[in-house]
From Swiss-Prot:
PROSITE patterns: NUDIX. Residues 8-158 form the Nudix hydrolase domain. InterPro entries: NUDIX_hydrolase-like_dom_sf, NUDIX_hydrolase_dom, RppH. GO terms for biological process: nucleoside phosphate metabolic process; ribose phosphate metabolic process. Its cofactor is a divalent metal cation. Coiled coil: none annotated. It is an enzyme of class 3 (hydrolase). Accelerates the degradation of transcripts by removing pyrophosphate from the 5'-end of triphosphorylated RNA, leading to a more labile monophosphorylated state that can stimulate subsequent ribonuclease cleavage. GO terms for molecular function: bis(5'-adenosyl)-pentaphosphatase activity; guanosine-3',5'-bis(diphosphate) 3'-diphosphatase activity. This is RNA pyrophosphohydrolase. It comes from Nitrobacter winogradskyi (strain ATCC 25391 / DSM 10237 / CIP 104748 / NCIMB 11846 / Nb-255). Its EC number is 3.6.1.-. Gene3D superfamilies: Nucleoside Triphosphate Pyrophosphohydrolase.
Length: 170
């Protein structure tokens, strides 16, 4: 069996979806990932297919999780951000193949209407990733995420903080 420290990171993308009021989309995670039910909210994220461009992967994941296509790209964090999952769940998460994720993050402006968001029947017939959603002030995000992902969210919020108050078209 592969030692935890020798496992690779899963290559993924994350998307901060910001509405016209500067609020950020968060979804309540479905499934068993949660260690503590207090921290079940997160932004859309997901895996990058082999050979797939990260920006295209981010748009695909956003659509597959929310049905959203009405976006304008605002920013990208140039670095890959990583987190490790707790050892206690490493054998179950991703069938024990990864120790965590390395993520490329993007911020986008949502230019559609809220009724475009459909987490119950997301794009391309994918299984729902979220059971509920809401708009949150950016500064609240780190308190909503599961603790082992918090350092990534702290960096994402720091990098994209100037976008929180930016209005569409400015």
């Amino acid at each position: 069996m592969t030692r935890y420290d020798d496992l690779p990171y899963r290559t993924c993308v994350g998307m901060m979806l910001i509405n016209e009021r500067g609020l950020v989309f968060v979804g309540r995670r479905a499934g068993v990932e949660q260690v503590d039910d207090s921290y079940v909210w997160q932004m859309p994220q997901g895996g990058v297919d082999p050979g797939e461009d990260t920006w295209l992967a981010a748009k695909r994941e956003l659509y597959e999780e929310t049905s959203v296509r009405s976006i304008e790209k605002l920013a990208e964090i140039p670095d890959w951000l990583t987190y490790d999952i707790p050892r206690v769940v490493a054998g179950r998460a991703w069938k024990g193949r990864y120790r965590g994720q390395r993520q490329k993050w993007y911020a986008v402006r949502f230019i559609g209407e809220d009724n475009e968001i459909n987490i119950a029947n997301p794009g391309d017939g994918h299984k729902p990733e979220f059971t509920a959603w809401r708009w949150e002030p950016m500064q609240n995000l780190t308190g909503l995420i599961i603790p082992f992902k918090r350092p990534v969210y702290e960096r994402v919020v720091k990098e994209f903080a100037s976008l929180a108050g930016a209005q569409a078209g400015t």
